[in-house]
């Protein structure tokens, strides 16, 4: 009997409470960076019925209207009706942002290497904190992402498209998806075993109508027919009713969907969240760099699966460790890949910022539907412009 395995990942829509918080935090970050690219920002958001609290630490010359940024973001998501219990114009906005700690700033603004005499400009900025970050890529999908999280993101994005276009008029902003994929004995995806979709709706919509629309207009529009069969299970709004949703149903907080933001649990995670943080925070920038490395390694044919770990000490520019794990799929020893990575990629925070051009206001668009593997927007860490350099570096190391 051949061994089959199941793996499940989930995603949530832009109207999920935690994702509302992420988008507000990143909208504030973008607004600040648009005026002050050198700003240091750590903006956290909490949302609940009728209220938004924004708090954290910033260092900037910019002035932004936080109240307006918050309301515009909520309106763009789709919370514009008072009956939702959370609407753009009636919500209470409570900002409480303070100056970044001087003790932290001194290590970020002048790294240990710079203080010890390194005159390289890219050694001037130190890591904003200690920590470990992971990046991953696998050849299961064209975007080199695991199939379960890729499909989960596509499902909730499709729901949002149908809601915003008015094609399914009874949909409301909050939604979740979950996809279970069956793998064969060679770890290749062969079918979708289970799809779970919970979507908020107007009270007049019937369960039968929702089920039919979701299966025909969402699931079958997203998941290739080859992956669906008579044994595929569909759970559509399995509680039977989802009228109360968004912050009226659950509070939301920045940084609570870190697995949705990355690889759906298929790869390890260092624990740091992304949204609301400028690129001196290696939780964010080094995670993007690690994805960039992993994706280019796989695209170069040096492995079919690659996980990259980076780790940093606060106030120090150079990473304390770089590890490449290919799970036995690499064409050369992993030590060779690690040496090649160090040759090709400058992994100091300033090097990452320069390499990926991370001082721009590009972050709000990443705050829903995943930071990795995006095909609908142009993100620098998704580009495959280091493939040739990696191949050549491997040759020099060998």
Swiss-Prot record:
GO MF entry, a single one: magnesium ion binding
Pathway stated in the Swiss-Prot or TrEMBL entry: Amino-acid biosynthesis; S-adenosyl-L-methionine biosynthesis; S-adenosyl-L-methionine from L-methionine: step 1/1
Entry binding sites for ATP: 16, 174-176, 241-242, 250, 256-257, 273, 277
Cofactor: Mg(2+); K(+)
GO cellular component: cytoplasm
Residue sites binding K(+) per the record: 44
Binding annotation for Mg(2+): 18
Binding sites annotated in the UniProt record for L-methionine: 57, 100, 250, 281
InterPro entries: ADOMET_SYNTHASE_CS, S-AdoMet_synt_C, S-AdoMet_synt_central, S-AdoMet_synt_N, S-AdoMet_synthetase, S-AdoMet_synthetase_sfam
Enzyme class, UniProt record, top EC level: transferase
Entry keyword Transferase: yes
UniProt-annotated stretches for the region Flexible loop: 100-110
Cofactor remark from the record: Binds 2 divalent ions per subunit.
UniProt entry keywords in alphabetical sequence: ATP-binding, Cytoplasm, Magnesium, Metal-binding, Nucleotide-binding, One-carbon metabolism, Potassium, Transferase
Subcellular localization: Cytoplasm
Alphabetical list of Gene3D superfamilies matching this protein: 3.30.300.10
EC numbers, comma separated: 2.5.1.6
Highest rank taxon of the organism: Bacteria
Catalytic activity: L-methionine + ATP + H2O = S-adenosyl-L-methionine + phosphate + diphosphate
GO biological process: one-carbon metabolic process; S-adenosylmethionine biosynthetic process
Chief location category: cytoplasm
Assigned protein family: Belongs to the AdoMet synthase family.
Function: Catalyzes the formation of S-adenosylmethionine (AdoMet) from methionine and ATP. The overall synthetic reaction is composed of two sequential steps, AdoMet formation and the subsequent tripolyphosphate hydrolysis which occurs prior to release of AdoMet from the enzyme.
Quaternary structure and interacting proteins, as annotated: Homotetramer; dimer of dimers.
Designated name of the protein: S-adenosylmethionine synthase
Native organism: Streptococcus pyogenes serotype M28 (strain MGAS6180)
